[in-house]
Amino acid sequence: MANTARIKDLSAVTTAADADILAIDGSNGTKGISYENLSTQTLDKLSSKTFSLSQGTKTLPAALNELYVGSPRNNAGSHNSIYRGVNLGTAYTSAMAAAIQAGTFDNLYVGDYLTINSRVYRIAGFNLIKNVGDNAAICNNMCLVPDASMYSAQMHNTDSGQYEPGSTTNTTEGAYVGSDMRTTNLAQATQTILNDFGSSHVIQYRDWLANAVADGQASGAAWYDCQVELMSEVMVYGTTVWGNTGYEVGCINSQLPLFRLNPEMIHRRFVYWLRSVRSAAYYANVAIDGCAGYNNASNPYGVRPLFFVN
């Protein structure tokens, strides 16, 4: 008796093994082909067939290769070129540290932020201090800047803690290195950041900092240990403005990717100090209206530092 079973009535399977045989009906009759051979032939056909795409006619392998070549890589260069702005959570994690140390920066992009103890720390760039310094090469690293001022402080302290007129209370002698901001007033920010990120992750590095002033401009510099520092005009604006000598630039000598990709992050509607010397009495700042400003050294303005982690 002839087999009258129809294909639709056969037991169904959801997977096929390479050795399974499928029926092929053609001019030479009905024959069998293994699933493995059919798959190989199908892929070969797809690989050689050309398709009309927006960038021209290409085979699938050529199109996929072009897509891969143009895709972002997991390295500092590509991650410095993308502003994402994603909330990364409330803690600096071991996974983040591992991604930084590996130099892949997985799931970390400029503009992403952590909210730790009600403080928002935003990623400002990657590997900005890699291989800088006079006696030690820094490896893979991530730069962060708080969105808000951590507190207000003076560049030159007064007994009142407020602006006081006069050349003795408004002096830039010693430039950034000699300022009360760096010698005393950044200590609170440093301790807060060490507590929030862990002292083993906040990098100590070396930078070339201005340490003398003549004729109202920085006139000397030297190497100093750094950890939590005020930003320079170059880091914020991408150029010098009021601090017009090379002593002001240091080793972090380009605009931070955060500010390059999203200038809105420069302008936060509060005044914050920069490290650059404007004159014998003034240091530079970012003004509340967005201007590249400056003011008397005894004014208490915002402390918005940068730091690096790994």
Predicted regions and their residues:
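Collagenous Gly-X-Y triple-helix signature in extracellular proteins
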Residues: 70-310
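Fibrous stalk/shaft segments of extracellular and virion attachment machinery
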Residues: 1-73
